[in-house]
Amino acid sequence: MGTEPCRFCEIAAGRSDQEIVFAGDGLVAFLCEPPATWGHALIVPRSHKEDIWSIEPSEAAAAMKLARRLAHAMRDELGAVGVNLRQNSGGKAGQDVLHFHLHVVPRYEDDTVQPGCVWGAPPWQPPAGGDAERRRVADALRSALG
């Protein structure tokens, strides 16, 4: 982890102003900054695990179960017509934060993000709407996830 605290560990511990949409015993889901589309969320384990090789099978299963719940909330509350799941492990794969994370990206009829893009630096333009839209989306997802 180096000398800097892990950004995702800080978020999982509640020491960030990131919009958390789900906080469970082992996992936290929060809105990605910048988002590819409104509702783009990251699922991370609360404990620091660097990559796919570091997490326990039970943690991987829990992350996928939460991704499914998020996908339903994105469809039902935000009007998503599809969803992309993405997990990058290792620098060559585009992992830029060394804490396991699973992207859950809702897709809309009018979005322009390429579904097959390889994410390192965001190849998309963040959606318009600003803080008010981010709060609306976070509130809708939090409500749906209970």
Model regions: which residues?
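HIT superfamily nucleotide-processing domains
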Residues: 1-146
